[in-house]
Design a protein with these regions (language model features):
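Short loop-beta-helix segment that forms the pyridoxal 5′-phosphate
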Residues: 44-68
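Conserved PLP-enzyme active-site core in the AAT-like
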Residues: 9-15, 19-22, 30-31, 59-216
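Short secondary-structure boundary micro-motifs
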Residues: 37-40, 54-55, 196-198
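Glycine-rich phosphate-binding segment of PLP-dependent enzymes
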Residues: 1-49
Length: 216
């Protein structure tokens, strides 16, 4: 798996013709920053996505998730988590805990379906939870602080297929933190419209002190 993913990243760099020029400093306002733009093209290639946003200004995975959610949800929309409660750090983003600037404050409602006792998806109640207001379904790949197992890409693909069968136009976003490069495929290979992650974790190789990405 490690060798496969190493080759996949190298191919992404080769396909986008990464060279020494991409590591040169730029001046001005950062317009037409060749290094930055090419890095984002590499991420899009590696994750088999149409495009990607990769920036140090996305200071963490939580920040990247906040941007992704805020960019796709509007007042009156509903966010659904079919895998139970997300990370504690997202509670204030969503509005589970009251916070200034939360999605709830801007009129975005939230609904969640807890996992079954054996840690599998509760498909029956997920189907009931999807309604005309459901705009985005967020799937947290990592178990986080919960005792449940981390989901495989295959499991995520099955869940996405189930959701899309009920409501094809719904946006399926995967919180990919801690999940990058641990399998030979990523959620974008099995139907995810968007994946979000942190450069502090797997993509940064333990070296990046900051950064995040959104690809879809």
């Amino acid at each position: 798996t490690a060798e496969y993913n190493q080759l996949k990243v190298l191919k992404g760099m080769q396909d986008n013709k990464v060279s020494d020029i991409h590591f040169a400093a730029t001046t001005g306002y950062g317009y037409n920053d060749l290094g930055r733009d090419t890095l984002e093209d590499v991420y899009a290639s590696v994750f088999h996505a149409e495009s990607a946003l990769v920036r140090p200004q996305l200071i963490s995975g939580t920040h990247a998730l906040h941007i992704a959610l805020s960019g796709n949800l509007r007042p009156g929309d509903e966010l659904l988590s079919p895998v139970g409660k997300p990370y504690d750090t997202l509670e204030e983003v969503i509005g589970i805990r009251d916070s200034v600037g939360s999605l709830k404050e801007y009129g975005v409602s939230y609904r969640q379906v807890d996992l079954l006792p054996d840690g599998t998806f509760d498909y029956e109640n997920i189907a009931k939870a999807i309604n005309e207001k459901t705009k985005l379904v967020t799937i947290q790949r990592s178990k986080g602080y919960d005792p449940r197992p981390t989901f495989s890409v295959k499991q995520i693909g099955e869940l996405i297929a189930f959701v899309k069968k009920i409501k094809p136009e719904v946006i399926c976003m995967v919180d990919n933190c801690y999940g990058e490069f641990v399998e030979t495929i990523e959620p974008t290979d099995v139907g995810a419209d968007m994946i979000v992650g942190s450069l502090i974790k797997n993509p940064g190789g333990g070296l990046a002190p900051i950064g995040g990405y959104i690809a879809g």
